Every structure is written in C-alpha cells, then in structure tokens.
Design a protein with these regions (language model features):
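Detector for small/aliphatic-rich hydrophobic stretches
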Residues: 1-116, 262
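Surface-exposed loop/turn and secondary-structure junction residues enriched for glycine/proline
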Residues: 70, 77-81, 85, 126, ...
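Solvent-exposed alpha-helices and their adjacent loops that cap or buttress functional pockets
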Residues: 82, 157, 189-191
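Hydrophobic/aromatic beta-strand patches that form the interior of the parallel beta-sheet core
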Residues: 88-90, 115-117, 139-141, 198, ...
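Conserved inter-motif catalytic segment of the P-loop NTP-binding fold
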Residues: 93, 102, 110-177, 181
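Catalytic-core regions built around general acid/base machinery
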Residues: 103-107, 181-192
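Phosphate-binding/switch region of NTP-binding enzymes
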Residues: 187-262
Length: 262
C-alpha cells in the first residue's frame, strides 16, 4: 500500500520547467562577389566575372563558332564557314560532293565526330581518306528512302555529333519528299544540341528552315594540251552563289577550281 501511495503521489507532483537553451545561429553567408569588387584593386577586379556571366559568354562563343569548308571563297560567302547549331543547304548540279568531303575532312581534323547520311551511296572510303577525312570519326549511314535519311539525320544531331551531312545524291531522289514540318523539327534539333547540319541535294529542299543556302552551278571542264597532242582533263571550274542567308546579304558568287586527283 505504501508503494502504491508513493506512485500516486509522484503522478501529482508539480512538473519541472524545461530550460530553453538558445541555439547559436549559423554565421552569415559571405558577401556576393559583386559586393567584394569595390574592395579589390582595379587590376584584379577587371579580371573577375560571375559564374552566370561565364556561362553566357561560353554559350555566345559556341554559337559564334563555325566549321570551315576549307574552300576559303565559300567560307567567306558564309561569314567564316558553317554556323554551329544551324542548317546550311547546298543545291544544284555542281560538284557538291567536293564541298561535302572537304567539310567532313575539316571537322574530323578538328577532332570532332561527323555523321554522313549518304542517300546517294556516293562515299568512296579510300578517296575520302586521301582527301583528309579521318574515317575513325565518321559514322556512315546508308538509308534506302529519303524519309529514312531525314530521320537518321535527326537522330545523329540529337546524340552529340558536331557535324551531320545529309546528301540526297543525284536526281531522282529515292522516296517521296518529306513535309516541311520534318525540316522544322530537324532544324530545332540541331539548334538545341549545337549540331551543324549540311544538306546537299540536286535542288532546294529545306525552304525557309535553313540558315543559308548555296547554289552550285553546273561545272565546266578545264583541259590541258592543244594542237595535235591529246587533251587531258585538268579539273573543273564551278560557280557557287549565295542564294539565302539570315545575316549576310545574298547574291554574291565565287568561282572554284577543282583539280582532278590522279
């Protein structure tokens, strides 16, 4: 009974007050970099920048980069070369394939990966390697229809290839023409992933979606020899005209002299 009474008494005893222990506050965050600039020497402050500004600067630099075609005259027409993240088209009956191979050679020599969607099945690996193409950095896709070619180009652009070339071959192009919406989707994919897209076709296909459009006129042969001596084909002369560009006034043209490789 005594034990039970003791337990009952303990239930009704006044409760002890809890002591509130103050919790120390964390130290204030360091001052923003912008607030520190006035306290630094001018020579040091001029060399500092914020992380956000650095990201914006790198993005601008990336957009301004180009991939050269290695034809100086053509690069000058395009303002330095093929713009990254943009679609450029070269159409016509001229020697378009020479520009295609030269551009792939330039990209692979810079250490970049290139995808070639070869609808016309025109690539000769041995000749391409002799022209400076690093075949280890080239993915060669050989579609059967034009729809497959456009789909393959979009997949390559979305998976990290810095240069994608879609060559439609000689007319007639195999398969039906794709709708304009497919070109719009392809252009947006390239812009989103920073991929440079070069479309080579016997006639204009991309419409208003391309950043620039070149037209290659039919080449004219150049011969060596005269009189009774046999004439030897020395090369071809081709005129390339800038038909459209969103930042450069179109209408200019240049002549290219392409030699015959023995």
């Amino acid at each position: 009974m005594v034990a039970q009474a003791h337990q009952l008494d303990s239930l009704f005893l006044p409760q002890r007050k809890l002591e509130i222990v103050p919790v120390p506050l964390p130290p204030p965050p360091p001052a923003a970099p912008g607030a520190l600039l006035p306290s630094l020497p001018p020579a040091v402050a001029a060399k500092l920048t914020s992380g956000a500004e650095l990201v914006r600067s790198l993005a601008r630099q990336r957009r301004e980069e180009v991939i050269p075609t290695t034809f100086a005259a053509v690069d000058e027409l395009l303002g330095g070369g093929l713009a990254r993240g943009k679609m450029t088209e070269i159409a016509g009956r001229g020697a378009r394939w020479s520009l295609v191979i030269a551009t792939i050679a330039a990209a692979t020599s810079m250490g970049e990966a290139a995808g070639l969607v070869d609808l016309g099945d025109a690539l000769d690996p041995q000749l391409a390697e002799e022209a400076g193409v690093d075949l280890r950095r080239v993915l060669w896709v050989r579609p059967k229809t034009f729809k497959e070619a456009v789909t393959a180009a979009e997949m390559l652009g979305a998976t990290g290839f810095q240069l994608v070339v879609l060559d439609a071959g000689l007319p007639p192009i195999r398969g039906r023409r794709v709708p304009d919406a497919a070109w719009v989707r392809l252009a947006r994919t390239c812009e989103a992933h920073g991929c440079t897209l070069l479309v080579s076709a016997p006639y204009a296909l991309t419409g208003t979606t391309s950043e620039a459009m070149l037209y290659a006129h039919a080449p004219r042969a150049r011969w060596l020899g005269g009189g009774k001596s046999p004439r030897v084909l020395a090369g071809v002369e081709m005129t390339v005209r800038l038909d459209k560009h969103r930042r450069i006034r179109p209408g200019q043209s240049v002549k290219l002299n392409l030699r015959v490789v023995p």
